[in-house]
Amino acid sequence: MNDKMITIGKVTTHQGNKGEVRVLPLTDYPERFELLEQVFLVRDNRVIEKRVEQIRFHKKFVIIKFEGIDDIGAALAYKDYFIKIPREETLDLPEGHYFIFELLGFEVYTDEGIFLGKVVDIITTGGTDIIKVKGDKKDYMVPAAREIVVNINPDEEKIIIKPIPGLLDL
């Protein structure tokens, strides 16, 4: 079940004294929380389905009131739980954009056909994201800039890059 879910947030603590939880969004689209009716709270192989009563935003956090959680103690019991949703409930992205989880495991090649490795992580920086590629003998940090990433082929699970001079020497 867990592999068919994506993580969109993490409960960091309670909010107030009426059972609300404070959630750090782990998505580029925090507004997606407004569409939630139910979520799965997951930690240490424990999965709990919860209905959402109310959502509001406070600074960089999402404040969520779940059905049946009505006091601080009950809210604190969910600290450090991840909020997950089924993959089929993800938002539609513009063409040419991908969720991080979709790119993990893709093979990365240069435009000359040299295999570099597989995508193991994508680091969001607030600017240009960095694609972390694990090779057989070496790891690479590739900026996800249009000038460098020339093709992403989801059908073949392949990314083609045109490395700038020195990029692969680091």
Swiss-Prot record:
Keyword annotations of the record: Chaperone, Cytoplasm, Ribosome biogenesis, rRNA processing
Subcellular location: Cytoplasm
GO aspect biological process, one term: ribosomal small subunit biogenesis
Family matches, as InterPro entries: PRC_barrel-like_sf (IPR011033), PRC_RimM (IPR056792), RimM (IPR011961), RimM_N (IPR002676), RimM_N_sf (IPR036976), Transl_B-barrel_sf (IPR009000)
PRC barrel domain boundaries: 94-167
Pfam families assigned: PRC_RimM, RimM
Subunit comment: Binds ribosomal protein uS19.
Family matches, as HAMAP family: Ribosome_mat_RimM
Function: An accessory protein needed during the final step in the assembly of 30S ribosomal subunit, possibly for assembly of the head region. Essential for efficient processing of 16S rRNA. May be needed both before and after RbfA during the maturation of 16S rRNA. It has affinity for free ribosomal 30S subunits but not for 70S ribosomes.
Comment on protein domains: The PRC barrel domain binds ribosomal protein uS19.
Family, similarity comment: Belongs to the RimM family.
Protein name: Ribosome maturation factor RimM
Gene, per the UniProt record: rimM
